């Protein structure tokens, strides 16, 4: 970056407060031009990002907001939670660095611009790798009326893994069926339903060992946290949370080696989570995908997936989904 460009940028703290995150978007001095394609007023909103690495397409997400001529952002990386990031805008193009711990090498830089209503650009890592990325405005997922529910469908029969597949078959050995339960031992692949769903009610029972971590991903994109090890994490990253976005209220106790249940309803972006019969998230909006999402195609049906990339033993049983008709 040139000295002239550095002098044109003044970093400030955003004044908008996201109550569900307990964090503030970081902002930078914007180009004073307003109006028209590529101006600061063209960028605000939620964006579903797709990053094309040499081996696969990865999901990411950013929410951009404008306040008094300044642009701020909250970023979901390849994993992790929504984190403030400083947005620089110059000559109608944006640039931002990925915060530490979001699944990218520290110092990774996004550079992009608006083209045909989409964000397009490059991701450059500190080791010189360069990937293409694109962003589409996230759909509202608003529904016109209450859903009509179909018939319940068991997703796990208790005997084998029929109806499930793995994101990484080479790491599938951590999963197995024991005494009618689906068990994860340690860290490895995610396990994913072969069927995809849009709006649904999901019942799932789980038993989380000491110092263990997993999660239930709705449509493969929104994680409801399961854990007994996040002692230093914020409430919106603990047991019962929609990870990084919505904290359960009241808090869900971490009780290892005990069978517990979630009853989760997802309609559009509206989620309700009931833990052991008590509502802990009541019809709250999920702003966007959570870290580790299988893709960023929020308008499409998606699978149920159980997280396998964290430590510890977690068992599951009685996994039943009731799709909307």
Where in this protein do the model-derived segments appear?
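Residue-level detector of intrinsically disordered/flexible regions characterized by low predicted structural confidence
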Residues: 7-11, 26, 203, 319
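Carbohydrate-interacting regions of secretory-pathway proteins
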Residues: 30-325
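Bacterial N-terminal signal peptides
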Residues: 10-22
């Amino acid at each position: 970056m040139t000295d002239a460009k550095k002098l044109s940028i003044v970093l400030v703290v955003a004044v908008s407060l996201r109550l569900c995150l307990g964090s503030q978007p970081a902002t930078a001095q914007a180009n004073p031009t307003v109006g028209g394609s590529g101006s600061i007023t063209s960028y605000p909103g939620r964006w579903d990002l797709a990053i094309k690495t040499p081996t696969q397409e990865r999901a990411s997400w950013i929410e951009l907001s404008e306040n008094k001529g300044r642009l701020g952002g909250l970023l979901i990386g390849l994993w992790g939670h929504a984190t403030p990031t400083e947005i620089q805008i110059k000559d109608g193009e944006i640039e931002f660095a990925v915060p530490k711990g979001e699944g990218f090498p520290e110092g990774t830089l996004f550079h992009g611009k608006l083209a045909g209503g989409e964000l397009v650009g490059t991701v450059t890592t500190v080791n010189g790798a360069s990937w293409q990325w694109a962003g589409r405005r996230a759909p509202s997922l608003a529904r016109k009326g209450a859903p009509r529910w179909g018939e319940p469908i068991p997703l796990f029969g208790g005997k084998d893994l029929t109806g499930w597949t793995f994101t990484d078959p080479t790491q599938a050995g951590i999963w197995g069926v024991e005494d009618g339960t689906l068990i994860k031992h340690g860290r490895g692949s995610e396990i994913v339903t072969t069927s995809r769903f849009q709006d649904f009610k999901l019942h799932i029972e789980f038993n989380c060992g000491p110092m263990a971590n997993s999660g239930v991903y709705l449509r493969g994109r929104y994680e409801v946290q399961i854990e007994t090890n996040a002692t230093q994490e914020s409430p919106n990253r603990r047991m019962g949370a929609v990870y990084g976005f919505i904290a359960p209220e009241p808090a869900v106790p971490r009780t290892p080696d005990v069978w517990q249940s979630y009853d989760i309803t997802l309609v559009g972006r509206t989620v309700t989570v009931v833990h052991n019969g008590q509502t802990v998230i009541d019809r709250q909006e999920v702003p966007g995908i959570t870290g580790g999402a299988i893709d960023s195609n929020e308008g499409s049906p998606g699978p149920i997936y159980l997280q396998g990339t964290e430590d510890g033993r977690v068992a599951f049983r009685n996994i039943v989904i009731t799709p909307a008709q």
